[in-house]
Amino acid sequence: MTHPEDEDAVAQMRSRLAELDIELARPELASRPTALRRAWREHARLRHVVTVADRCHELCYDLQAARELTEEDPSFADEVQRLEEELDRRRRDLTELLAPSDPLDVEDAIVEILSG
């Protein structure tokens, strides 16, 4: 990742994800379907963000290793380029995922369509 505030945001999401894991393990949550559904949705969203952030870290490590290998063997240049492109894509994805979303996006909606 590139920005410290992104690192902080992902760290907070990891913490919240751990809290949700504990909350979702409680049997009494099953008796409250709305709260259960909301918790699972938040868990899925946070898990996705954390997974993308983890992949960015892996790609940074792999890219550094590939660059070192390229110094010894130029045939790794293609791998460096591939990793740079994937890292750029993942960073854009992460930036998009970290952008504030509309809280109403996760609410169910009833749409009535009338002809006439």
Segments (PLM) and residue ranges:
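Charged, heptad-repeat coiled-coil alpha-helices that serve as long linker/dimerization "arms"
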Residues: M1-A109
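Short, hydrophobic beta-strand segments
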Residues: A109-S115
